[in-house]
Amino acid sequence: MCFLRRPGAPASWIWWRMLRQVLRRGLQSFCHRLGLCVSRHPVFFLTVPAVLTITFGLSALNRFQTEGDLERLVAPSHSLAKIERSLASSLFPLDQSKSQLYSDLHTPGRYGRVILLSSPGDNILLQAEGILQTHRAVMEMKVNHKGYNYTFSHLCVLRNQDKKCVLDDIISVLEDLRQAAVSNKTTARVQVRYPNTKLKDGRNSFIGHQLGGVVEVPNSKDQRVKSARAIQITYYLQTYGSATQDLIGEKWENEFCKLMRKLQEEHQDLQLYSLASFSLWRDFHKTSILTRSKVLVSLVLILTTATLSSSMKDCLRSKPFLGLLGVLTVCISIATAAGIFFITDGKYNSTLLGIPFFAMGHGTKGVFELLSGWRRTKENLPFKDRVADAYSDVMVTYTMTSSLYFITFGMGASPFTNIEAVKIFCQNMCVSILLNYFYIFSFFGSCLVFAGQLEQNRYHSIFCCKIPSAEYLDRKPVWFQTVMSDGHQQTSHHETNPYQHHFIQHFLREHYNEWITNIYVKPFVVILYLIYASFSFMGCLQISDGASIINLLASDSPSVSYAMVQQKYFSNYSPVIGFYVYEPLEYWNSSVQEDLQRLCSGFTAVSWVEQYYQFLKTSNISANNKTDFISVLQSSFLKKPEFQHFRNDIIFSRAGDENNIIASRLYLVARTSRDKQKEVIEVLDKLRPLSLSKSIRFIVFNPSFVFTDHYSLSVTVPVLIAGFGVLLVLILTFFLVIHPLGNFWLILSVTSIELGVLGLMTLWNVDMDCISILCLIYTLNFAIDHCAPLLYTFVLATEHTRTQCIKSSLQEHGTAILQNITSFLIGLLPLLFVPSNLTFTLFKCLLLTGGCTLLHCFVILPVFLTFFPPSKKHHKKKKRAKRKEREEIECIEIQENPDHVTTV
């Protein structure tokens, strides 16, 4: 190996160049030996992967389990909301107070919920009798368990004061309306106010979550209701932590959903939408059931595309079965990874649907690159040497890209990831990448060895029979010549490589390369990139987090229908926020009262403190000290029927003869708009800091906070860590690769593709949830997988001009890139027909990933690389210097030998 020093080049530059050359040659030598090993022992490398697949695949069938805890999967694993839940539950058990802590979709425990929606223009309050009939049907519904019949009254959550079932207050309002209708009174006699209304027993009740689509009486100071479109009723079940009770509750929920479907057929004037505690999990898992057949269709499409794109008219050099076997190689590696996952007690969830597509996109890239590497080898070499040369040419880059896949998804599986679904996905993806790499160089490499042996012995690539001689073919019909032709007629004197006749390679060489490097095309490509960058930047400014669980459910499921109706008619108020004062407080102190009022300002409050202050004022009672305050509270206020329910909101302690209030709770409800979730997160972020700055020590909690607390940060951390990891690896290897500009261009290309996918998916109404984040991590690797070979071939090319270098790069790697991206995109098409929000997100993100990568590899990079470094002039100068030196030597020889001139 000889290294010539440039004039003026420092010694360190020489050493770095030597180190890069040694590393590159060392890796190529290792891959060459690996190829020789595989070519000499193909049966062994074919058998071992097959045995592994059979072993782990069969084990997976016996251990298949699904994940039933949705909170564990999609809620942030470590959040302040979970700590607040633990503290709040230690003070006031959540199972007893879940009726007060209303939450849209994340109510804890078991329950049944129904929305009754009237026809457009109708007032649902005038249909009280029909709604109460539905209510009575629920109350009388029975479920059988071990010979005993259970009704709602056996399973319901009981009130502490009278041990009756906890029911929504809207039921009491409807009873009053029905009685008024029966007694021929006008509905004006029953005053329904919104959001707070006064019940018959004297209580003030918040019904903002039970009455929807409200139209108030114009100019009404007391917020009287003129009409309403929807009513929401929730039936809360008690579980007691018993497995038997939980089983009975599950049966009751199933019967409840069946009853709602039956009642919908009977009540044509009302639309019924039901929800139960298991509905979200059922509709989340439903995506997997809906996708089964579509995944098989996707596999068939990829197999067909790979087979056709690997074919040629030349029956000797065509490799259709290698394309098919390459896809099957990736499939069995995925099956092995799934077996390992289930053997290690993994539980399946619908987010893992992306792994086959992710692994296929990377695995088939290695398959097509090996096929292209085989075509670039010399035909006159033995097939074992050709396999080794193909490994030496391809496996270095494939090893590097596989390592980056492992690093990025390994970082996603690290403890820094706060979403369990993302962590599980990344762990499985790491295993899939390792097995993918092993199966490509072993199983598919063995298939390549057998195919090479058939080609060397001149066997037909499809029928595996000997190819007749040219003289024999000339005497046969045209159809026989077409089927059995080995391409001897197509090969001309100026084109000695028969593989140049592959239709993709021929198209790129003869048509596309000349067109894309045309000087008149380049301005339009620059304009196209500016448009691409503008839309991407515009989308990046509109990113929104996807904390809503609806993004992961089947789109035609009852849960999604319920959530849409709920969002439309019950979005005026946030979920009920529990305001827990967990330290003793001087409630009788005027400054404390002012602080409480200031904290509760802007909220609709359901507060014992506010009601008590009003009671003292109305009764003209003075309670300015601790003794009077607590005495009147216990002996008078809490004993009145309309205030007895506040007993559950205060914790008293007795020290000697003195009573103390050690903790209490209030309920706050914020006014919201259609974007309820975002506004609730803003309210939470504003209230929490106040608990540290104010003299009142409190926490705020609602069950939905567990799913939304810092979700946007939790979900974006994996892609940020993965991106940082890729950037760090590329920077650290800046001086180890054969040309540093290759890494520089790779960083720019990957950044452009990543930001393009991020911006365009936002414009396509894709939120930042766990699925889109996983796709963004994959985009980093997919871009590197396809851009790296193209860029490194370009920077190492020694042609005279950049245009010739990019043509050479496209001719060398363009076929494999186009084959892989085309197969990848065609394989995504069946996902479009799965009625699921999860698969819609997966389809959109992966389609943008493939599309943006294709755009950069075949349009943007071929044009931009002709404008910017690396310059190819020094190669031209070197060749001119060598030619000039050779001419001078020839002249000297002529001068020294005059006889030669005379002879000539």
UniProtKB/Swiss-Prot annotation:
- Record key words, sorted: Glycoprotein, Membrane, Transmembrane, Transmembrane helix
Q: What does this protein do?
A: Could act as a repressor of canonical hedgehog signaling by antagonizing the effects of SMO, as suggested by down-regulation of hedgehog target genes, including GLI1, PTCH1, and PTCH2 in PTCHD4-expressing cells.
Q: What family is this?
A: Belongs to the patched family.
> InterPro entries, alphabetically?
Patched_domain-protein, PTHD_SSD, SSD
Q: Which residues are glycosylated?
A: N149, N625, N820
Native organism taxonomy: Eukaryota, Metazoa, Chordata, Craniata, Vertebrata
Could you tell me the membrane topology recorded for this protein? Answer: Multi-pass membrane protein
Enumerate the transmembrane spans.
41-61, 295-312, 323-343, 351-371, 394-414, 431-451, 523-543, 718-738, 744-764, 771-791, 823-843, 845-865
Name of the protein: Patched domain-containing protein 4
Gene name as annotated: Ptchd4
- Tell me where in this chain the SSD domain is found: 291-450
Top-level lineage group:
Eukaryota
